[in-house]
Amino acid sequence: MVRVKICGITSLEDALMAVEAGADALGFVFHEDSPRHVPPEQATGIIAGLPPFVQTVGLFVNRPIAYVNETAARCRIDLVQLHGDEPPEFCAAVERRVIKAFRVQDITSLDPIKHYRVAAHLLDAYSPKAYGGTGLTFNWDIAAAAKEFGPVILAGGLTPDNIREAVEAVNPYAVDVSGGVESAPGRKDAAKVREFIRRAKA
């Protein structure tokens, strides 16, 4: 069964709602340019209120390695998601398991993947304007092809309306959603979250 990560959590209320709906992991965005940015102290408080067996993921974009490791330790997050231009040697210096994001334009976007030794590869749609959270989709056949390099987390424009089709097309290790289940940036819509998870795991 595919696993589901709900990203862009900004409140304990949304976090607990997502867990109750069946989310396997929650994402916290430590990228100040994002409308879903959450300060480390706020994330720490939310994470402290979570029940056991829920994985937490911290998302970083081109931050210094010291900041990544210090924030991960301070907030007690389980995995680090690197969504910028971080090279393989940067990933190797992270003191948590790493999910490396790759922004997909075409099949050549997979070329760098083989150089990374990480826990999973997250595939998101390319946009020249942002490092993620754009709501754009990409060719899911490329995501299916990426599975030969390791576990794939499918992201990019996923919604309750297209998640079933996406899972059937790719059969990814996990799916990642943010804007597709929101009523406003950083505010999750409970009905959308429940429907997304139900269809993803159907």
Curated annotation (Swiss-Prot):
Alphabetical GO biological process terms: L-tryptophan biosynthetic process
Record keywords: Amino-acid biosynthesis, Aromatic amino acid biosynthesis, Isomerase, Tryptophan biosynthesis
Uppermost EC category: isomerase
Any one GO molecular-function label of the UniProt entry: phosphoribosylanthranilate isomerase activity
Gene: trpF
Stated name of the protein: N-(5'-phosphoribosyl)anthranilate isomerase
E.C. numbers: 5.3.1.24
Pathway per the UniProt entry: Amino-acid biosynthesis; L-tryptophan biosynthesis; L-tryptophan from chorismate: step 3/5
Top-level taxonomic group: Bacteria
Catalysed conversion reaction: N-(5-phospho-beta-D-ribosyl)anthranilate = 1-(2-carboxyphenylamino)-1-deoxy-D-ribulose 5-phosphate
Xref: InterPro entries: Aldolase_TIM (IPR013785), PRAI_dom (IPR001240), RibuloseP-bd_barrel (IPR011060), TrpF_fam (IPR044643)
Keyword Membrane listed: no
Family according to the record: Belongs to the TrpF family.
Organism name: Geobacter metallireducens (strain ATCC 53774 / DSM 7210 / GS-15)
